[in-house]
Regions:
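Buried hydrophobic core signal strongest for RNase H-like alpha/beta domains in large
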Residues: 1-456
Length: 456
């Protein structure tokens, strides 16, 4: 259910253009450059802010969110025999939804990466059906858990050598096997937990160094990072936070707070990570580009609605990604329909799910109040891992700024040889010709919008 104040728009009638003033393709492409001022400013501000949060023990606390309303969820009957594996399946799903909501002018349709890929191409192939007639289809990227996972996955691939060394040194070779080199969605929760304790440890280690003589201020992040690069091991620690871990944390927190335009800045930042050969996020890079297209190209009143609905107010405590409700439903079906499994039993379960889930959410509201409401009460204690990793960094890199910044190009952390992640990003983002950032952006966005949109 959408609050009335978000429904006052006039651009979504059949035959009426849902787009605003034409975008400049050059200006659009420039948003993804490594030097883009908005992206750089956010990274630098975030670095300082997150180190200060680490200092006061609030780094992993959920944002304090004012949720204006709680979404009312209606769960439709399951669509049997279709997935996202083919365009025909996704088109059938769209048609079922359009038929059930033919009195609507707009359908914002969420999904995981594969669903969004299919929808983007269906809009390209059949604009007369999905854009020029109602209900208009606007794809909404599922940003938590899927978006968070893929942002993490791209950076994890770049920093896997550091992660491996940190896990082995902190946990011991046998226990460290739980921290995998190539995470999948199935092990997302355990791997992001590992990322969080490494993030805390690296943050607290940099804070320790910053309080010793000669250290630059953390309020000057560019100078701070440049000094860290004198020692390759300290550079690994600093860039792990600056380019990767803080991006993942920032992304997750912004979805929780429904800060839509800030999420767009983070997708633009992700481009530099996902576009590298090591990260190889060949599906999520084009999807990130299209996410920004929809955020920028819509008519102002429709864009206002789009940004307000970026994340779903699932409870009084927090917003979630558009992919979260269906993930919860899938998990509930798996747990709740264990015996005599049949189509009829699953349909009955889905029909009753809203009441069960609403009751569960109400219980969580109570528990959140009892535990103080910062979200960390649900997380396994990580203090021993954090302390052990900090000890490793102190022993191998140095206990003060002067020691840690002695020029050194040979790792003492046991990190395997290879191109440094931050160097690979710079090289990837400075390619000439057809592989340049502007050419890549233009190629993707023009191809996927050529039947219904024209850039300046």
């Amino acid at each position: 259910m959408i609050p009335y104040h978000l429904m006052l728009f006039s651009c979504a009638f059949a035959g009426k253009n849902p787009f605003g003033p034409r975008l400049s393709i050059a200006e659009f492409a420039s948003k993804f450059l490594l030097s883009n001022q908005e992206v750089v400013a956010n990274k630098q501000k975030r670095f300082t802010a997150y180190l200060k949060k680490a200092a006061d023990g609030t780094l992993l606390h959920r944002p304090d969110v004012n949720v204006p309303y709680v979404a009312h969820m209606t769960y439709h009957k399951p669509m049997w025999g279709v997935l996202q594996s083919s365009y025909a399946d996704v088109e059938k799903e769209l048609e079922v939804m359009r038929e059930q909501h033919k009195d609507k002018r707009i359908l914002f349709v969420g999904g995981d990466g594969l669903s969004i890929i299919r929808m983007n191409h269906l809009l390209l192939q059949r604009p007369e059906r999905y854009i020029d007639s109602t209900p208009l289809i606007i794809p909404v990227q599922g940003e938590a858990p899927h978006g968070v996972f893929h942002v993490m996955h791209g950076g994890w691939r770049l920093y896997s050598r550091f992660i491996r060394a940190a896990a082995d040194a902190t946990l011991g070779i046998e226990l460290a096997k739980a921290v995998v080199d190539e995470p999948t969605v199935k092990v997302f929760n355990t791997q992001i937990y590992a990322l969080w304790w490494m993030t805390r440890a690296c943050s607290e280690y940099l804070l320790l160094l910053s309080r010793t003589p000669g250290a630059p201020s953390i309020d000057q992040p560019a100078e701070f990072i440049a000094e860290c690069e004198k020692n390759v091991d300290l550079a690994w620690v600093a860039h792990f936070l600056y380019d990767f871990a803080y991006l993942v944390l920032n992304f997750k927190q912004e979805v929780r707070a429904n800060r839509s335009k800030h999420i767009d800045v983070l997708w633009r930042e992700f481009f530099s990570v996902g576009n590298t050969g090591t990260a190889n996020k060949t599906n999520y890079v084009p999807m990130a580009i299209m996410r920004i297209f929809w955020a920028d190209a819509l008519a102002p009143d429709l864009a206002h609605l789009y940004h307000n609905l970026r994340a779903i107010p699932m409870s009084k405590r927090v917003f979630v990604g558009w992919d979260t409700p269906i993930e919860w439903l899938n998990g509930a079906i798996t747990d709740g329909v264990r015996q005599l499994v049949s189509d009829a039993r699953i349909e009955e379960f889905v029909a009753n799910y809203y009441l069960m889930n609403h009751s569960y959410a109400s219980l969580l509201d109570v528990l959140e109040v009892l535990h103080g409401g910062n979200g960390t009460s649900h997380m396994k204690d990580m203090s021993s891992n954090v302390d052990e990793m900090k000890k490793w960094l102190v022993d191998k890199v140095g206990k003060d700024w002067a020691t840690a910044t002695v020029r050194n190009s040979s790792t003492k952390l046991g990190i395997k040889r290879g191109v440094l992640p931050w160097v690979e990003v710079r090289e990837s983002m400075s390619q000439p010709g057809a592989d340049s950032v502007p050419a890549t952006i233009c190629r993707h966005v023009r191809h996927l919008t050529k039947t219904f949109y024209a850039f300046r």
